[in-house]
Amino acid sequence: MSFAPVYNAHSRALILGTWPSPKSREMAFYYGHPQNRFWPMLAALTREAVPAREDIEAKKQIILRHGLALWDTLERCTITGASDASIRDVVPNDIAGLLAKAPIEAVFCNGAAAYRIYTKLSLIHI
């Protein structure tokens, strides 16, 4: 199962990944691999301090303070390691349900696989 989405009533942009990596699943939160550049990049864009790797609450607060939402395109899948190329047996997350709950105006896919899955399976266009 994927992680719960991070969003609130002020979320205007949704960032979609594909599926949590093994390190992210180990940490129980998005982009948990120490070499992943997501959190340093987001901190630079928002002029926030880079949150500690283990500080899940600080990461959630950066997302929410800046009107963002964070989720993955897949609820379940079969995957070998962290290779998006090996993904099969996909079950998409209910992205339409999330969009009905929050005033999302834009969706940004964090990679080619997330974009391909979002456009193929969700059939949602903002």
How would you name each of these model-derived features?
Residues 124-126:
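Conserved small/polar residues in nucleotide/adenosyl-binding loops
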Residues 1-106, 112-121:
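A polyanion-binding, active-site-adjacent surface
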